[in-house]
Curated annotation (Swiss-Prot):
Residues 259-554 are annotated as: Catalytic. The gene is thrS. It is found in: Cytoplasm. GO terms for biological process: threonyl-tRNA aminoacylation. This is Threonine--tRNA ligase. GO terms for cellular component: cytoplasm. Binds 1 zinc ion per subunit. Belongs to the class-II aminoacyl-tRNA synthetase family.
Length: 658
């Protein structure tokens, strides 16, 4: 046997090793149980891969990002095998890894029942213990069609070879190169137990799956299109250790308690009535108070920063979106047109920027007016697929705190710097403090404008982001078609990351709208345009804050800031007078004068997460005092009325959490 030379890469260390022809990646890392795959000259491979002369081989640990994807993808295969063993009529869809887990789609006669999921999980445990080997096999298109003749969805995927998309998970099954099938082989006999069309790579055996759990099932359209059949999707999660699985399940339990949809109902804040439609929320009085306070504070801060408020309609002629390019690039995300005025197409607006451009262009502009900062709480409508609509965080109708800044190229860097600083400070005012930044750059397949303009815009944004001394993460190809952007990513109280504000530099739309201002030398000049949404949308930010605070909003945002609780009927009038005085100071204070016993009143207000309970008994009435009871159950007694009012006002004005 001849020798081959390979380079083994571990972090920054490189080791050259001479091995015999036919040596596998598994042999290179023999005895290292945490290594479950290899990256060979940049491509992920199974450990069964035979290394070739001159290749660079990197170990893939099960706890790495690649390793977790492989673990979860292999677990999805085990789940699909279990389903077909229990439900032989089930037809296979797609089963990719996703964030923190995996799913697989099945065409079955009836939806899965919770008891079915228990049976499937038990069968998966049996398969895991069998230690079946994952074995890769290259097949021709014709052979694949013959082998998978009873799997109609797999046959469709074979036809996508070379054009499969990551959007629907199809690219985990077929790529641009050779077709492969993964066989699950009996550990002792090598006999075929199950197989699936798949690109891989996979774990060496099913025994390499340390910990998993099935989470739920849901309906899902085949490949995400509502024109396709409805399938049944089972979601699961898999982790390198049982302790990590336990920690993840505890995290999910905490996240479920904080789910804004659950809290929205329990606290009577908002609802999404079926009669109105999916993704279209209505805010109840208490939710309306929170939203109004959020908007009022944002409006005041924007005025202080030199923004000018504008208002635009909800619908427009389609010609406007032809000019902006949205009909070329964004039509799938828009509601269908309404034909009015003898066949003229009108659209609900998905974005505010084209209308703001018309405001800029309504009259001649001078360089002395720049930067011009136009701001609007603008409601937009986007046709999100039903499968991705999620409460207030992914809606079909929502209001953006949308600003468009027009400036000279010389002002561009300073304006971006001011904008990002303003954005971060305003988010901190609402109680978010843990950030990192993401820089989204050009998608080579989907952009307008010149390469030079994109390069200039991207480099300017990079420099502005780096000034903030926050972590900066690259998002290659993630920008919208009209310009690169900075996204502010915020971590909430339980460590989840939310994309919040976006700041997008745009050299394209001023060209499309022929926007001009008169420069100091009298020349007509194109302005630079900056898109900026701080909350993203009011609805989404409302949901993020609700989950961040687990419904216990800080007093300045709470719909009811304090509730008076009388020890007895004789104390109601005293509390009503206190509440009236508090309301005159701008506080939101109620009195619970119901016939319920005091302890029940306290429990009721605790469930409603009211920041302060104002308790009054005989001693308080005679001494001109009140007692504060806080959310954590602690109490402060005998506070003079004036001091109590002053404290409430101070806590609200300073936006302190209690």
């Amino acid at each position: 046997m001849s020798d081959v030379r390979v380079i083994i890469q571990r972090d920054s260390e490189r080791e050259e090793r001479v091995v015999t022809t036919g040596t596998t990646a598994a042999e290179l890392f023999a005895g290292e149980r945490s290594i479950i795959a290899a990256r060979v000259s940049g491509d992920l491979k199974d450990l069964a891969y035979e290394v070739k002369d001159g290749e660079t081989v990197e170990a893939v640990e099960i706890s790495s990002e690649d390793g977790l994807d492989i673990l979860r993808h292999s677990t999805a295969h085990v789940m699909a095998q279990a389903v077909q063993e229990l439900f032989p009529e089930a037809k296979l869809g797609i089963g990719p890894p996703v964030k923190d887990g995996f799913y697989y789609d099945f065409d079955v006669e009836k939806p899965f029942h919770p008891d079915d999921l228990k049976a499937i999980e038990k069968k998966m445990q049996e398969i895991q213990k069998r230690g079946q080997r994952f074995s890769r096999r290259v097949v021709t298109d014709e052979a694949a069609r013959e082998e998978l003749a009873d799997e109609p969805y797999k046959l469709e995927l074979i036809g996508l070879k070379g054009s499969a998309s990551s959007d629907d998970g199809a690219d985990v099954e077929v790529g641009a190169g050779e077709l492969t099938i993964y066989d699950n082989l009996d550990a002792k006999t090598g006999e075929l137990c199950w197989k699936d069309l798949c690109r891989g790579p996979h774990l060496p055996t099913t025994r390499n799956i340390p910990a998993f759990k099935l989470m739920r099932n849901a309906a899902a359209y085949w490949r995400g299109s509502e024109k396709n059949p409805m399938l049944q999707r089972i979601y699961g999660t898999a982790w390198p250790t049982k302790d990590e699985l336990k920690a993840h399940l505890e995290f999910l339990a905490e996240a479920e308690k904080r789910d804004h949809r659950k809290l929205g109902s329990e606290l009577d804040l908002f609802s999404i009535p079926e009669q109105i439609g999916s993704g279209l929320a209505v805010f109840h009085p208490k939710g309306g108070i929170i939203r109004r306070v959020m908007e009022d504070y944002s409006r005041r801060r924007h005025e202080e920063e030199g923004y000018e408020f504008v208002y635009t309609p909800h619908a427009t002629k389609g010609k406007l979106f032809e000019t902006s390019g949205h009909l070329d690039w964004y039509a799938d995300g828009m509601y269908p047109p309404m034909q009015l005025d003898e066949g003229v197409d009108y659209y609900l607006k998905p974005m505010n920027c084209p209308m703001h451009n018309l405001i800029f262009d309504a009259r001649g502009r001078s360089y002395r007016e720049l930067p011009l900062r136009l701001f609007e709480f603008g409601t937009v409508y986007r046709y999100e697929k039903s499968g991705v609509v999620h409460g207030l965080t992914r809606a079909r109708g929502f209001t953006q705190d949308d600003a468009h800044i027009y400036c000279t190229r010389e002002q561009m860097s300073e304006e971006l710097d001011k904008t990002l600083t303003f954005v971060l400070n305003l988010l901190r005012d609402y109680g978010l403090n843990d950030f990192y930044l993401e820089l989204s750059t050009k998608d080579p397949e989907k952009f307008v404008g010149s390469d030079e303009a994109w390069e200039e815009a991207t480099e300017t944004l990079r420099q502005v982001a780096e000034k903030q001394n926050l972590e900066l993460v690259a998002d290659p190809g993630g920008a919208a078609f009209y310009g690169p952007k900075i996204s502010v990513q915020a971590r909430d109280a339980i460590g989840r990351t939310w994309q919040m504000s976006t700041i997008q530099l745009d050299f394209n739309l001023p060209e499309r709208f022929s926007l001009e201002y008169t420069a100091a030398d009298g020349a007509k000049t194109r302005p630079v345009m900056i898109h900026r949404a701080l909350f993203g949308s009011i609805e989404r930010f409302f949901a993020v804050l609700l989950e961040h605070y687990a419904g216990a909003m800080p007093p300045w945002l709470a719909p009811v800031q304090a509730v008076g609780i009388p020890v007895g009927d004789a104390h109601v009038q005293y509390l009503e007078e206190f509440a009236a005085e508090a309301r005159r100071k701008g506080l939101r204070v109620d009195v619970d004068a119901s016939s319920d016993r005091m302890q029940k009143k306290i429990r009721t207000q605790q469930k409603q997460k009211v920041p302060f309970m104002i308790i009054v008994g005989d001693e308080d009435m005679h001494g001109g005092t009140v007692s504060f009871r806080y959310r954590d159950g602690s109490q402060e007694n005998g506070i003079p009325r004036d001091q109590a009012l002053a404290k409430l006002v101070d806590v609200v004005e300073r936006r302190i959490q209690v």
